[in-house]
Amino acid sequence: MDALYKSTVAKFNEVTQLDCSTESFSIALSAIAGILLLLLLFRSKRHSSLKLPPGKLGIPFIGESFIFLRALRSNSLEQFFDERVKKFGLVFKTSLIGHPTVVLCGPAGNRLILSNEEKLVQMSWPAQFMKLMGENSVATRRGEDHIVMRSALAGFFGPGALQSYIGKMNTEIQSHINEKWKGKDEVNVLPLVRELVFNISAILFFNIYDKQEQDRLHKLLETILVGSFALPIDLPGFGFHRALQGRAKLNKIMLSLIKKRKEDLQSGSATATQDLLSVLLTFRDDKGTPLTNDEILDNFSSLLHASYDTTTSPMALIFKLLSSNPECYQKVVQEQLEILSNKEEGEEITWKDLKAMKYTWQVAQETLRMFPPVFGTFRKAITDIQYDGYTIPKGWKLLWTTYSTHPKDLYFNEPEKFMPSRFDQEGKHVAPYTFLPFGGGQRSCVGWEFSKMEILLFVHHFVKTFSSYTPVDPDEKISGDPLPPLPSKGFSIKLFPRP
């Protein structure tokens, strides 16, 4: 029955490319509508015999998608989930992006979804994300293929490997602050941290230092990201169409880089560990098989997306939150100056120094708790699942969300307050499956340590260069349109240089 459904949808996509005036289009569309109606009736009859979670599915194929997307863009997802939890409980059904979906709230629900990959559930992305990220990335691969892909990326993102890249990242951040921040009375934070985060990726992923080339790639990425949240309509004038074109252009550039790097590796003018591109090109699985070009292309698309969003959001929001919590900012300053006091003039930050930035990382964690860069992720049930007295049918989507734990006083005391100290002692007082800014389980973000390193080094160099700052508009709102949550106007600040 699922195969029939998929073939019907495929046929629909095919006939929608026909001239709408043709009689064949009308006949085909009527037939498809009839088949889909029969499928809905069949599924409805089967599901009526099951004890499904409470909730409402709404209009077929549409459900509550528009309400959900509106909440996403207005930064009111917490309210969306809270209203349904209050009405239906911690387990409820809805319909999102064309699929019946069960939302599991709280740490128990998070644990069920995140700890049962390929046992009860498997990763599920909306179709437009799959088209833009590709089917061969670490984010989309499943089972053994996913494990192999994570193994390939560990050669770059593992803590041992990251230590060798501190120097390059440190140099780029210091250069960026000297060029874009130092000597300025006022700056707008968001566009600057976006530029910095992307340029770091361009250098450490592809060894691209040329600013014009960095800008060109950055614009392509922005086009792809905006299209990720647009209606999946592949027609001129639509954001999704522009995103697909951007991905095609990105592929062309990447293929040229891959070809050149293969030649350089063979000649010895490039090393196997100089950047992520070299790491992926020289990786071999336990059978001695290298990654294909498509696998490398899709991973770069996925990683550029993930590393960009999950880092720019906390980097920008740290400024906003610390500006309204000056006592916390002073603790950050004290920690960073203490590290500097133990360094010789011109001596660079080391991995040991990063490990000593405990309070600074607590500030970043609290920022991620209050404004998680991801609201959660979807999975698909690969078997009927029994949970909390309900049946979640095979084929239905499941959604876990950070909004069911991050802002709740059941898990975090006075959650509305900015309290970095709640993460002291390595966060041992934080209950499992309640703090999930980078996901969890087998699919936790492979690059979270990379993101952590960027944030800590950036804060260090800012404190080293400036004694303080004040916001131009302390009450600037946070927007989630598009994801992730960000200052709606970029958050302008006045800078006061260190004497």
UniProtKB/Swiss-Prot annotation:
Q: Name one GO biological process term.
A: paclitaxel biosynthetic process
* Cofactor(s) needed: heme
Family to which this protein belongs: Belongs to the cytochrome P450 family.
Role noted for this protein: Catalyzes the first oxygenation step of taxol biosynthesis. Can use both taxa-4(5),11(12)-diene and taxa-4(20),11(12)-diene as substrate.
**Pathway recorded for this protein:** Alkaloid biosynthesis; taxol biosynthesis; taxa-4(20),11-dien-5alpha-ol from geranylgeranyl diphosphate: step 2/2
What Gene Ontology molecular-function terms does this entry list? heme binding; iron ion binding; taxadiene 5-alpha-hydroxylase activity
Q: InterPro entries per the record?
A: Cyt_P450 (IPR001128), Cyt_P450_CS (IPR017972), Cyt_P450_E_grp-I (IPR002401), Cyt_P450_sf (IPR036396)
The UniProt annotation places heme binding at C445
Membrane-spanning residues: 22-42
Native species: Taxus cuspidata
GO cellular component labels: membrane
- Which Enzyme Commission numbers does its entry carry? 1.14.14.176
Q: Which domain of life is it from?
A: Eukaryota
Q: What is the lineage of its organism?
A: Eukaryota, Viridiplantae, Streptophyta, Embryophyta, Tracheophyta
Q: Does the keyword Coiled coil apply?
A: no
Q: What is this protein's record name? A: Taxadiene 5-alpha hydroxylase
The enzyme's main class, written as a single word, is oxidoreductase
| SUPFAM superfamilies from the UniProt entry | Cytochrome P450
